[in-house]
UniProtKB/Swiss-Prot annotation:
InterPro entries: EF-4, EFG_III/V, EFG_V-like, EFTu-like_2, G_TR_CS, LepA_C_sf, LepA_CTD, LepA_IV. Its EC number is 3.6.5.n1. Keywords: Cell inner membrane, Cell membrane, GTP-binding, Hydrolase, Membrane, Nucleotide-binding, Protein biosynthesis. This is Elongation factor 4.
Length: 600
């Protein structure tokens, strides 16, 4: 077991694309944890989606042994964290397991919105922070300006920031020395009752549930009988190991160390992330402070295109929820789409990633309904209901007022794009709170309704600013809004999957847009199909799909007009009856395209 004074637990935090995972690769390479022939870029990003999109989704851990300049060998436990706003929960869990952070800032781009958000999380976790300036070999790198920015915007002393290039491998030993000399060692007592924090858990087809732990007090050993304090489940450990970066089994894990344990756990609900593991025969007096549970902000329905896949979808969601503690789901049914699940996500990228993982890893074909947020309905009788699905909205007569969630957004961008971004925020009912300039970049603080952000705000922001703006938000609370439920009727029948809550001022525009889209997507039938958007009983937009005409006069060559008239009248009668009883088939592709409308 390593002496506590020679252990360093640290995480790497940064904005998207500032080079966290590349720096992690270089640290692994420098410490010789993996042979050169097995080395590959973004070594710790082991999901296909992560490698393709070039983003980190799951926080990963690895143990490195580093011989420092003072001659001692140090055990470094590294957590590589995601940079995207939707995965902030992964970051908060990683930070809780460490004592220090390396803050990576791109020397050409400077401090971005997500840099700020992650730094504030690290400061809340009482971390010692070492600033590292990456990409110093780029022609556009401006080290003095970025150092000044770190001091002005974040308030960290950047005079002794480590200057590196992770890609070229310049000054990597400088980072390792800074970790050893400037970050604090963990505290803990090997003789105390066992307390180990569950940082993450995932399902392995051979081992059952694999639990990633950080030992605080006591020690974990193979064959030990342990109890999960939140669920009360008891298990005997059959494996104790570390990631280095491959799985390696060890006899024990002591205080301050990170590793994994397995105990033939089948039920994924036994291992709650943030729970404390203790020894069955020497229970710890109190559990460790866990993480604040994440609150989903975006909800949408996931339905299998083939109803026979419903059970597979349920099982797949269970396995994903184990690996992603911030993802929640419950069963729902829809008249248009059959049985499926109402799922809660941290944001739109999170939704997209979960959908893509279900389709790839579990070979499922899915339909996603329009994303919505959680509204609070204050009823006339004084009760308050939360509504996740617009189709479940009670009768408007019974509702006193509706409240919607608002966010406080930090937007950082080059000042030449400021006009377009201000206009975008105003269109989305935003309230400007602050505008400051830091060396050619503007920092905007806006309050916005979350409903306006979940559709396509991020994409629009990126296109207006040519990709230079960065965006981060925190939930502010609920405020009353003039909100209405917009129903879509096809052939006078409401389609529950297309119902949405909109602000009254935007209802007509949204309704017209959706009706026009559906008109192009629903195939023509032998009778006329009206498509309407309605608020309550009032129709606000309408499009009509013309009927296909069957030529009933094809076989009448010349002849008497009354014969033709009889055939035409008979056709007219049939069409009238058809319009009354005919079913309109809305193809799946029309649903998917209509639901994607808001995201374009």
């Amino acid at each position: 077991m390593t002496d506590l004074s020679r252990i360093r637990n640290f995480s790497i935090i940064a904005h998207i694309d500032h080079g966290k995972s590349t720096l992690a690769d270089r640290l692994i390479e420098f410490c010789g944890a993996i042979e050169a022939r097995e080395m590959k870029a973004q070594l710790l990003d082991n999901m296909d989606i992560e490698r393709e999109r070039g983003i980190t989704i799951k926080a990963q851990t690895v143990r490195l042994n580093y011989k420092a300049k003072d001659g001692e060998i140090y055990q470094l436990n590294l957590m590589d964290t995601p940079g995207h706003v939707d995965f902030a929960y992964e970051v908060s869990r990683s930070l809780a397991a460490c004592e220090g952070s390396i803050l990576v800032v791109d020397a050409s781009q400077g401090v971005e919105a997500q840099t700020l958000a992650n730094v504030y999380q690290a400061i809340d976790a009482n971390h010692e922070i070492v600033p590292v300036l990456n990409k110093i070999d780029l022609p556009a790198a401006d080290v003095p300006r970025v150092k000044q920015q770190i001091e002005d915007v974040i308030g960290l002393d950047a005079s002794d920031a480590v200057e590196v290039s992770a890609k070229s491998g310049i000054n990597i030993d400088g980072v390792l020395e800074a970790i050893v000399t400037r970050l604090p060692p963990p505290k803990g007592d090997a003789a105390a009752p066992l307390q180990a924090l569950i940082v993450d858990s995932w399902y392995d087809a051979y081992l059952g549930v694999v639990v990633l732990v950080r030992v605080v007090n006591g020690e974990l050993r193979t064959g030990q009988k342990v109890r999960f304090m939140a669920t009360g489940a008891t298990r005997e450990l059959d494996r104790v190991g570390i990631f280095g970066p491959k799985k390696m089994l060890v006899d024990r894990l002591g205080p301050g160390e990170m590793g994994f344990v397995t105990a033939a756990i089948k039920d994924i609900r036994d291992t709650k992330v943030g729970d404390t593991i203790t020894e069955e025969k020497r229970l710890a007096p109190t559990p460790l402070p866990g993480f604040k549970p994440s609150i989903p902000v975006v909800f949408c329905g996931l339905f299998p295109t083939d109803a026979a896949d419903f059970e597979d979808l349920r099982e797949s969601l269970g396995k994903l929820a184990l690996n992603d503690a911030s993802f929640q789901f419950e069963m729902e049914s829809s008249a248009a789409l059959g049985f499926g699940f109402r799922c809660g996500f941290l944001g739109l990228l999170h939704l997209e990633i979960i959908q893509e993982r279900l389709e790839r890893e579990f070979n499922l074909d899915l339909i996603t309904t329009a994303p919505s947020v959680v509204y609070r309905m204050h009823m006339n009788d004084g009760t308050m209901k939360e509504m996740h699905n617009p189709a479940d909205m009670p009768d408007p007569v019974k509702i006193d007022r509706i409240e919607e969630p608002w966010i406080k957004a930090n937007i950082m961008l080059p000042d030449e794009y400021l006009g377009g971004v201000l206009q975008l925020c105003t269109e989305r009912r935003g309230i400007q709170k602050d505008l400051t300039y830091v060396g050619g970049r503007a920092m905007l603080v806006y309050e916005l309704p979350l409903n306006e952000v979940v559709f396509d705000f991020y994409d629009r922001l990126k296109s207006i600013s040519r990709g230079y703006a960065s965006f981060d938000y925190v939930l502010e609370g609920y405020r009353e809004g003039d909100l209405v439920k917009m129903s879509i009727l096809v052939n006078n029948e409401p389609v529950d999957a297309l119902a949405m809550i909109v602000h009254r001022t935007q209802a007509e525009y949204r309704g017209r847009q959706l009706c026009e889209r559906l008109k192009d997507l629903i195939p023509r039938h032998l009778f006329k199909i009206p498509i309407q958007a309605a608020i309550g009983g009032r129709v606000i937009a309408r499009e009509t799909i013309a009927a296909l005409r069957k030529d009933v006069l094809a076989k009448c060559y010349g002849g008497d007009i009354s014969r033709k008239r009889k055939l035409l009248d008979k056709q007219k009668e049939g069409k009238k009856r058809m319009r009354q009883f005919g079913e309109v088939e809305i193809p799946q592709s029309a649903f998917i395209a209509a639901l994607r409308m808001g995201q374009e």
